[in-house]
Regions:
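Active-site loop segments of alpha/beta catalytic cores
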Residues: 1-252
């Protein structure tokens, strides 16, 4: 396939074949939801805990074997560049870029989340999710964790199991103060502001206040601000441009 594409595109367009992003994701929960349904999965936590945990363990081990096989066959790629990483970030680091055939798992960013377990206790989160997700996630050089779910009261479990954590998602539903205390300078504080403040109208003074409040609470953290899940911006990009200006003002 790559040779055929080269014959067609040579001299016209630079291209690179890469494995699907989903291969790098070690979450497993969404696959289980597709198999069982979310409601059934919630019941399984109580009705069949041992069986469910063994299935998650099998999924983690299977994904890890796939990753190692891709590494052996030199089919990985260096995602430490301008590539979507984690749950909205870019993969930039100061490490030198490598050709695909030279890339090892330890050169890459990996990712997992537990959105489907947003309302599950920290104990169940640790037992069923993170303890099995770590099998694949710890193979990577750098790990991202979390997406739209709040990780309140779950940070300690993440640190216990994920040895390479470098980026933690802080969603609009997260406790900012707890996140700032728990993340500190251990990882990137990957903040996702509330998109409804743009999607449902734009109050400049309210947005400035909102951003400054978060900036004060996170002043000792390594911050990145990712505006996600904007389904509409009111037929104008002016609000997005202004948001960027206000964010730079608040966090500078």
């Amino acid at each position: 396939m790559q040779e055929k594409a080269g014959d067609v595109l040579d001299g016209i367009l630079d291209f690179e074949f890469q494995i699907p992003y989903s291969v790098l994701v070690q979450s497993h929960l969404i696959e289980m939801v597709h198999l069982r349904g979310l409601e059934n999965l919630m019941y399984d936590l109580y009705d069949e805990p041992e069986l469910l945990n063994s299935v998650f363990r099998h999924m983690g081990e299977s994904k890890a074997r796939l990753l190692k096989r891709l590494e052996e066959k030199r089919l990985l790629f260096d995602n430490r560049i301008n590539i979507y990483t984690g749950s909205g970030s870019l993969g930039y680091t100061n490490a030198p870029w490598k050709e695909p055939e030279d890339v090892k798992l330890k050169d890459m960013w990996g990712f997992a989340d537990a959105q489907e377990f947003s309302n599950v206790s920290p104990e169940m989160f640790e037992t069923f999710a993170i303890a099995n997700q770590k099998i694949g996630l710890n193979l990577f050089g750098r790990g991202c964790y979390g997406c739209c779910e709040p990780l309140d009261h779950k940070y300690e479990a993440i640190y216990r199991h994920i040895t390479n954590i470098r980026r933690l998602s802080v969603s609009p539903w997260s406790d900012i103060e707890e996140a700032a205390e728990q993340i500190g300078q251990k990882a990137i504080f990957s903040w996702k502001p509330d998109p409804s403040k743009i999607c449902t109208g734009f109050d400049e003074s309210e947005m400035r206040k909102y951003l400054k409040e978060v900036a004060i609470k996170t002043k000792d953290c390594y911050m990145e601000v990712i505006l996600k899940d904007i389904r509409t911006c009111g037929h104008t990009n002016r609000h997005l441009v202004k948001f960027i200006e206000l964010a730079r003002e608040a966090f500078s």
